[in-house]
């Protein structure tokens, strides 16, 4: 077992960094001179404000996870920069999310026009380190890395309605986004199969809509497991997750899908549908014909109330409202909808 562990590098006392990470930086230039030797005596020093202090703490945590080394952090001064890892902002750098990493025997410097740019440089350094559990030293070859994102919007999506994920898992997902320099998280929170965010003005959305009495097993299947399933995020949890993401320079874009994909909401408040129900939170995958009633004034009040609370929770510039897969069969036969069409 020890031989295998050593082969994997898990208990090795020394190893080399590898700068060929994902996403690959724009420019990796080998520099002259000796490598830097990262060890337990290394300190992380930072120039700047609370954002840079947080960056330094993140880097210390990342290095501890990868190597077992527990490095201390400190505000940079004239005496403590040489031989250590220095985090700094540089007003001469033009791209707000860009960064520069310089490694030499004298130390490591990560520079960025903003603290956000420095954070992305930290991710590149983090990914360059080998995975060790008891490292005494890591050698980082002399190098100059210059990088900046090609795309302003770099995001991923997570559907937490068809398959519910815990708040802790969502944070782990955000960690993975941060690791890969993502800056947007599209959080899918409502569906036919579940309404998974607390709305205080409409408590039945989570009392009823967050839970389904069974789930179709497999794709294009009529097999139902008849197992109660679901969950939801309290507003307190949402605020915590929003801050967690913001600390990692990730903006969360919540999705409240409408007027389709609203069966869970209709199960909680059947008066919002064209037929008045009864409705049941969706079991199977696909498109349901029951959607919000477009001719009912209560529908528009419901939408306003929900979005008011969502906007209070999420500081994002955008709120995603879906708009897809909304069959019109119910509207075509609904007197209220037809009257609305006629009037408007």
Residue spans of the language-model regions?
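Bacterial N-terminal signal peptides
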Residues: 1-11
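Contiguous, structured surface segment used for ligand recognition
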Residues: 15-153
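Residues at alpha-helix termini
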Residues: 66-67, 180, 248, 344
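Feature activates predominantly on carbohydrate-active enzymes
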Residues: 94-320, 334
């Amino acid at each position: 077992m020890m031989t295998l562990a050593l082969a994997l590098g898990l208990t090795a006392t020394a190893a080399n960094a590898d700068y060929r990470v994902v996403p690959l930086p724009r420019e990796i230039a080998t520099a002259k001179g000796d490598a830097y030797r990262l060890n337990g005596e290394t300190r992380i020093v930072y120039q700047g404000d609370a954002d840079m202090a947080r960056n330094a703490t993140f880097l210390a945590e990342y290095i501890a996870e990868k190597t077992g080394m527990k490095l201390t952090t400190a505000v940079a001064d004239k005496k403590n920069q040489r031989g250590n890892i220095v985090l700094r902002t540089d007003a001469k750098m033009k791209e707000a999310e860009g960064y520069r990493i310089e490694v030499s025997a004298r130390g490591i410097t990560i520079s960025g026009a903003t603290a956000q740019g420095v954070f992305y440089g930290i991710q590149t350094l983090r990914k360059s380190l080998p995975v060790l559990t008891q490292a005494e030293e890591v050698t980082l070859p002399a190098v100059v890395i210059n990088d900046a994102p090609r795309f302003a919007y770099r995001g991923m999506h997570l559907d937490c309605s068809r398959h519910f994920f815990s708040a802790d898992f969502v944070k782990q997902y955000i960690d993975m986004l941060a690791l890969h320099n993502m800056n947007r998280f599209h959080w899918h929170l409502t569906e036919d199969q579940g309404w998974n965010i607390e709305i205080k003005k409409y408590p039945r959305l989570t009392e009823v809509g967050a839970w389904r009495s069974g789930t179709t097993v497999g794709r294009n299947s009529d097999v139902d497991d008849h197992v109660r399933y679901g969950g939801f995020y309290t507003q307190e949890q949402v605020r915590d997750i929003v801050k967690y993401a913001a600390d990692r320079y990730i903006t969360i874009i919540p999705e409240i899908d409408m007027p389709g994909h609203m069966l869970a909401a209709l199960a909680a408040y059947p008066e919002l549908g064209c037929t008045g129900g009864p409705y049941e939170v969706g079991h199977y995958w696909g498109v349901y014909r029951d959607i919000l009633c477009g001719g009912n004034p209560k529908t528009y009040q419901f939408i306003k109330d929900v979005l008011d609370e969502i906007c209070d929770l999420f500081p994002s510039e955008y709120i995603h409202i879906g708009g897809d897969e909304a069959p019109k069969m119910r509207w075509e036969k609904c007197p209220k909808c037809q009257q609305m069409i006629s009037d408007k």
